[in-house]
A protein has these predicted regions:
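Charge-rich, low-complexity segments
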Residues: 1-59, 65-69, 80-286, 292-306, ...
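"Short basic amphipathic alpha-helical interaction patches in structured regions
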Residues: 74-79
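Short beta-strand->loop micro-motif that forms the acidic, two-metal-ion catalytic signature
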Residues: 309-313
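An aromatic-glycine-centered, glycine-rich loop/turn in mixed alpha/beta architecture
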Residues: 324-327, 331-334
Length: 359
């Protein structure tokens, strides 16, 4: 695990020191005081508390308000939390247990039962089409849309809404009478079934031989001044697009976007000749086994391009994955290694290519 930053340590020390004074406050005021503390140390994060004034222990929720780039920081803050007798520390706003609720904004009220949702595929994510089940005055259209986003965050939970949901479009009367619409108040079980049954994200690691599919793609295609791709007859030989071959592990779709497989790790190696290519393929395949057997990660695709072979893995922990792969990366064929790691909970690096297979 990553060592907590000094800022995280300073925040938790300040919070621990303030526990006695915090406990003397009503819960609403306690939340405000706690946020004043976190604001001093950790930009972009906030604290929420779930419980009642009389509860001896309440949930202390660390949130990034849906900002994915701050999700790793949320996880680090929660992992570094000390023992707190009055708090259960949690990462991200969880789904509400009461999804049928109204909210008001500037004199306008809207209930989740009045927000209708249809689900569609958006790459590996779920796209949402939203319409309202009653007439919304023209002056409140923007309010209603903003309220719907707030509701979605509460109904689906902060992490799922930020990571699993793709495009969100507001529509008028439905064009297709057969499209199933569900009230937002009833969305969670419908969304979960769509996620596992329609999109195939069961969350279970594949067993046995993985299934692979391949395609040839062109990169750096020349375009005209309007951004349109040039026809082959209009391309000079020196401007010809670069060809690459991608092999996609379609079995990996089952664990796509699992919260514990959020880091994209790329092992990028030069393959100047056929012997080196064979050795690199063997190394990257062995790396896949080293990661997948303990379910530390999974190989999702390979890309041959410009004399290099890239293998993309999604892993649960950057440092543990690097430690597990370290002996393999000492081999001669790894001398040209470029090792890259990025936080990518939506698996965009995978669906950038897997999306072509279902297009």
């Amino acid at each position: 695990m990553t060592t907590p930053s000094p800022a995280i340590g300073a925040f938790w020390r300040a919070f621990s020191d303030a526990q006695a004074s915090l406990q003397a406050l009503p819960l609403r005021e306690r939340v405000g005081a706690a946020n004043a503390l976190i604001d001093q140390h950790l930009e972009g994060l906030a604290l929420e508390m779930s419980g009642d004034d009389a509860d001896a222990v309440v949930d202390l929720i660390v949130t990034a308000h849906g900002s994915i780039e701050r999700f790793p920081l949320v996880a680090q803050v929660v992992a570094a939390a000390p023992a707190l007798p009055h708090y259960r520390v949690r990462a991200f706003r969880e789904r509400t247990t009461q999804p049928d609720f109204p909210i008001g904004m500037e004199g306008f009220e809207l209930a989740t039962s009045e927000v209708l949702v249809a689900l569609e595929q958006d790459g590996g994510q779920a796209a949402l089409e939203i319409r309202f089940g009653r007439e919304i005055p023209s002056d409140y259209q923007d309010h209603a849309r903003n309220m719907a986003f707030i509701m979605l965050d509460h109904v689906l939970g902060e992490y799922d809404f930020a990571v699993k949901v793709g495009a969100v479009d507001f529509v008028g009367a439905p064009d297709d009478a057969h499209t199933p619409w569900v009230p937002l108040s009833q969305l969670p079980p419908v969304f979960d079934r769509y996620w596992t049954e329609t999109l195939g994200h069961t969350g279970h690691f594949p067993t046995g031989e993985s299934e692979w599919d391949g395609l040839e793609l062109q990169f750096d295609c020349p375009i005209d001044e309007d951004g349109n791709e040039l026809s082959p007859d209009d391309i000079n030989s020196e401007d010809a697009p670069e060809t690459g071959v991608v092999m996609v592990n379609t079995s990996a779709n089952a664990v796509a976007m699992r919260a514990d497989l959020a880091y994209a790790l790329t092992v990028d190696l030069a393959v100047p000749d056929s012997d080196t290519l064979t050795a690199v393929q063997d190394l990257q395949d062995q790396a896949a086994t080293v990661l997948q057997v303990p379910q530390l990660g999974i190989l999702v695709l390979t890309l041959m391009r410009a004399g290099r072979r890239q293998a993309l893995y999604y892993v649960s922990d950057e440092q543990l994955a690097k430690q597990a792969l370290a002996p393999l990366l000492l081999r001669d064929e790894a001398a040209s290694l470029e090792l890259k790691v990025a936080y990518d909970p939506a698996w965009s690096g995978y669906f950038e290519y897997a999306g072509y297979l279902s297009a």
